Amino acid sequence: MIYFNSERVEVKKFPNGESLIHSENLKVRSDDNEIRVYFENDEDITHLMFLKSHLDELRIKCNLILPYMPYSRMDRTEGITIFTLKHLCKLINNLNFESVTIYEPHSEVSTALLDRAKVVNMSKMLAERLLKELDNGKEEVYLVYPDAGAAKRYGKEIGYEKILTASKERDFKTGFIKKLEINGCVESKSFRAIIVDDLCSKGGTFMLTASKLKEMGATEIYLVVTHCENTVFQGELLTSDLITGIYTTNSILSKDHKKIKVYEI
């Protein structure tokens, strides 16, 4: 789904599936024009290429906003798999945007490969906002990082002392987590916890983390992620009593639930 200057770009289909993009409704500004891509599927990349090429012909400069950077998971070559993120970044660079803004990239490789890239640390902002909401002086609040990568990333971004970090052991053949432990000390018998990460799919890791936190005395457990996929409805996060609420954005998520608070970006 593509927006140009906050207006959704109209795309129709020919009978054979080819796209027909209407340009007469594009509201062009004198400066600071922007294309915003809410990635749903690979068609969005094709439409982005067509729209930017059209604007180039009109000599209209433009910035690109990516609430979610597509193909961030494929940030390296493993065996015979294709380094998809590298090739997508090359395509975006060739479109020659004035700037490319990414919200909470899943991989730092994205910003390394993109020209004129800017990053919005959205999970940091969401976590800090929730910390203020929960700070009532009655129960201690701990930030919980679900793995070493999250601890390294958000430990630098968020200035907060009460930290717990999970360490996990995976079965490399199946991908399932065999063991998970919480590292760090809790000073009181009861506390509230905020798990912070960038992305949630079905939420298996977060369920295991929350289960361990409950054993340690957590009374309320919140999950903060910038990107929440619709597959969260296929997992147990929303049906279990372990998670009190999920704080996320509309970068990917397109469904509603009473336990999910969505911030628009």
Predicted regions mapped to residue ranges:
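PRPP-associated nucleotide enzymes
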Residues: 1-265
